[in-house]
């Protein structure tokens, strides 16, 4: 296997976090006096940084965005975080990689303390060698998060791959100088066509396909 380090995005890649994220979004919109989100807007919240979705997609001011993020995190920390569930076969995939000597980590836009709590409650102990996420102010780019994970792992970029479900992941991998595998079972890419235009070495529809692709690279 070419890769000595495999990094996963979290939302829409490691775990289906939609139920908790959707509930937190609706709570935050209600608390800030906005109309409920429709299905398309809810889906857009899974993966990207919260500052992006509230400002660019909801049209909020900076002050409104700050209040919305506070409300989102209030609900998410109490309830939404624990509504998540790993995708079928994900724990088994990770453990098989670990048995082959691969170092496994997470690089997510989710706040790092939330990511650690979620993964610690949903995956067996020892699955992840590093968990890197966003800072509380949501100022880190995906590339910076990826690079922080690589640095902590002591990995070489040429032997590292990021797996994710959105163009944010693809762009972050490219900016960080690592390979990228797109997945179509999350909330971003829905098919191979969606991943066109972004550097990637493969497109996978489930965990079995991820494992098979990594084995032949």
Which residues fall in each region the model found?
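N-terminal helical cap/lid subdomain that shapes the substrate entry/recognition surface
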Residues: 2-92, 100, 113
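Substrate-recognition/cap helix-loop segment adjacent to the acidic, metal-dependent catalytic center
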Residues: 30-32, 52-62, 83, 91, ...
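Short secondary-structure boundary segments
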Residues: 109, 135, 166, 184-187, ...
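Acidic, Mg2+-coordinating phosphoryl-transfer loop and its flanking beta/alpha structural elements
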Residues: 161-202
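Short acidic-hydrophobic, aromatic-tinged amphipathic segments that line or gate anion-handling sites
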Residues: 201-209
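Short amphipathic alpha-helix with an adjacent loop that forms part of the alpha/beta core around
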Residues: 210-217
């Amino acid at each position: 296997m070419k890769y000595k380090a495999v990094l996963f995005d979290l939302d829409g890649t490691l775990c289906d976090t939609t139920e908790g994220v959707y509930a937190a979004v609706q709570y935050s919109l209600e608390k800030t006096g906005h109309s409920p989100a429709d299905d398309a807007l809810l889906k857009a919240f899974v993966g990207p940084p919260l500052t992006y979705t509230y400002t660019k997609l909801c049209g909020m001011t900076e002050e409104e965005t700050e209040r919305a993020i506070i409300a989102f995190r209030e609900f998410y920390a109490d309830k939404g975080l624990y509504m998540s569930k790993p995708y079928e076969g994900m724990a088994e995939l990770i453990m098989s990689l670990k048995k082959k000597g691969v170092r496994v980590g997470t690089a997510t836009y989710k706040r790092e303390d939330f990511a650690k709590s979620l993964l610690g409650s949903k995956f067996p102990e020892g699955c992840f060698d590093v968990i890197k996420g966003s800072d509380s102010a949501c100022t880190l780019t995906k590339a910076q998060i990826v690079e922080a994970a690589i640095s902590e792992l002591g990995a070489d970029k040429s032997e590292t791959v990021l797996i994710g479900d959105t163009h944010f992941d693809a762009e972050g991998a490219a900016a960080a100088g690592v390979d990228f595998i797109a997945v179509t079972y999350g909330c971003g890419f829905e098919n191979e066509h969606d991943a066109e235009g972004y550097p990637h070495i493969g497109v996978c529809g489930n965990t079995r396909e991820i494992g098979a692709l990594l084995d032949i690279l």
